[in-house]
Amino acid sequence: MDFDGWLLGRLDAVKRDGLYRTLRTQETALKTKGQKRQTWASNDYLGLSKDERLITAAQTAMSRFGAGSGGSRLTTGNTVWHEKLEHTIADFKQTEAALLFSSGYLANIGVLASLPQKGDVILSDQLNHASIVDGCRLSKAETIVYRHIDMADLEKKLASVQARNRRFIVTDGVFSMDGTIAPLDRIMALAKQYQAFVIADDAHATGVLGENGGGTSDYFGVCPDVVIGTLSKAVGTEGGFAAGSNIFIDFLLNQARTFIFQTALPPSICAASHTAFDIISDMHDTRRELQSSVKMIKTRLADMGFTVRGGDTPIIPVIIGDAKTAVSAAALLEKKGICAPAIRPPAVPEGESRIRLTVTADRSLQDIDELTEAFDSIRKELNINK
C-alpha cells in the first residue's frame, strides 16, 4: 500500500465513526462563508481581541520592533515588551515572577517535562487538558490519574505515594470541555497535608474568575506553587506563561526546552497583552454581566430538557450523546445562524459528544433569545432528550 492509500484508510475509519474534522474560514469576526453568524464558540471571553486599545498598542510596537521577534529570547528575540509583560503577569497573578511561552500548550509541556524527575510522581485530574497529558507523558516521573475533581480519590492516591521523592498535583483551574472549576482550596489543603507541590493551569480562568479576574487563585484566595496560563482566551491575544517564584522562573529559563528553543512572541503581541491586563482588573461590571448571561442560558436550556454541565464559568457544555447526532445538531444550528461546533471524542469521552457553548461579554439579550430559540428548534427536529 502506498503512503497516501494507507492514510486514506485511516481517515475513512475516522469518517465512519463520525469524527472527521475540517477547517472553517472566518472572513471577519462575524461572517463565515459570506453569511452572518453568531459565534458561540470563541474563547475571547471579555471581547478584548477587538478592543481598539489593544490594536493600537500592537500597531505602535510593530512600527518600532517589526512584525516578528527574529529569534529566541536567549538570542535576539528579547525586548522591553517581553519583560514588561512578564512583570505585569507576575503582579496580576500575585507571584514573584513569570515567563512567556509561545502558547499555553508549550507552557504546560515545558513545565511538566522539566520539573518532575525520575522517582517523582504526578497526580493528574482525569479531565486535564491535552497539553497537560502530553507534558506528563514527556516527564520522567510516573503519572497517576485521579477521578475528576474527586478529592477523596486524590487523597487516597496521595497517601499511597508518600515514599516517592516528590509529589506534584496538576490540574486545570477551569476544565475546558466541562466548564467545571477545580476546588483549588481543597487541593492546596491536601498538598500541605501530604507535602505535594501544586501546578494549576488557569487558561480558562484568567480574566474571568475572581474579583479582579485573577483566576482560580483569586477565586479561592490561595497561591499554588506554579500557575500556568494563556493569553489567547480572555486576554484576547496569543501566547502562554508560567508564573511562580523567582527561582522557579530562573529554572525554567535554563531547563524548559519549549522556552529555550522557541521563537519569542512578537513584541506587538506583548504590547497588546500588557494593555489587556491593565484593562482586565477594572472589568468588574463586565464579569458580573457575563455571569448573568451564563446563568440565563443554562436555565433556559435546562428547562427545555437539555443536559447542561458547567460551573460558574462561561463554558456551557450541552450534552447530546453520540457523535453523529452532535454533528447533525451543530449543522442545524449553523443553518439557523448559530456557530457552535460539535465536540467529539477524543476531546470528550465516548457517548458524551456535545455542543460546547462559550459565552462572551458582548452578547445581547437578543443574541441569547436567538440562541435558545435555535436550540429549542433543533431539539424538536432531532428528537433530542425525549
Curated annotation (Swiss-Prot):
Reactions listed under catalytic activity: 6-carboxyhexanoyl-[ACP] + L-alanine + H(+) = (8S)-8-amino-7-oxononanoate + holo-[ACP] + CO2
Keywords: Biotin biosynthesis, Pyridoxal phosphate, Transferase
Functional note: Catalyzes the decarboxylative condensation of pimeloyl-[acyl-carrier protein] and L-alanine to produce 8-amino-7-oxononanoate (AON), [acyl-carrier protein], and carbon dioxide.
Keyword Transferase: yes
Binding site for pyridoxal 5'-phosphate: 104-105, 176, 201-204, 230-233
Residues that hold substrate according to the record: 21, 129
Molecular-function annotations in GO: 8-amino-7-oxononanoate synthase activity; pyridoxal phosphate binding
EC number: 2.3.1.47
GO biological process, one term: biotin biosynthetic process
Cofactors, names only: pyridoxal 5'-phosphate
UniProt family annotation: Belongs to the class-II pyridoxal-phosphate-dependent aminotransferase family. BioF subfamily.
UniProt modified residues of type N6-(pyridoxal phosphate)lysine: 233
Top-level lineage group: Bacteria
The protein's assembly and partners: Homodimer.
Recorded metabolic or biological pathway in which this protein acts: Cofactor biosynthesis; biotin biosynthesis
InterPro entries per the UniProt record, alphabetical: Aminotrans_II_pyridoxalP_BS, Aminotransferase_I/II_large, AON_synthase_class-II, AONS_Archaea/Proteobacteria, PyrdxlP-dep_Trfase, PyrdxlP-dep_Trfase_major, PyrdxlP-dep_Trfase_small
Record organism: Bacillus velezensis (strain DSM 23117 / BGSC 10A6 / LMG 26770 / FZB42)
Protein name: Putative 8-amino-7-oxononanoate synthase 2
Principal EC category: transferase
Family annotation (NCBIfam families): bioF
